């Protein structure tokens, strides 16, 4: 049975990229087998998340990793962590009311994406700096306030030509005790 025919959903050939809104990407057979095996038993999800995070962090040579259900979910989680800064449950419980926290995100992006909405959903305030224009490191630094918690760089080919290099932005973030978030974005579709 074809589930998409049953639901009357049109299928297509994805010749663009692994984009969440277009079904992301197809799963490898190994992944499908692991999911089938995992579905036969019950586990404590928090324990599973921690174990999988450790494994992915090792595989990707990172200090930590966390599995989410797409870009927007990942940015929402990252935004919450950037605002709270410390693993204190009572601070997370305040969200999405982040008015007492450092809750401003300097967002360098070329166009509207799910990233800005995810930041707002977590309780953050978006400060657009490079929306469709050239921007210098000084422009970004001028946008930093005592309420700023992170610089978020949504990389596209066009934006990378209009903004300071990622390394310079990261050093600026560290200089001001800010988190630096990087989101690699596919280029927009033209029809």
Predicted regions and their residues:
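A glycine-/small-polar-enriched, mobile loop at the entrance of the PLP active site in fold-type I
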Residues: 14-51
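Conserved PLP-enzyme active-site core in the AAT-like
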Residues: 1-22, 26, 53-67, 72-191
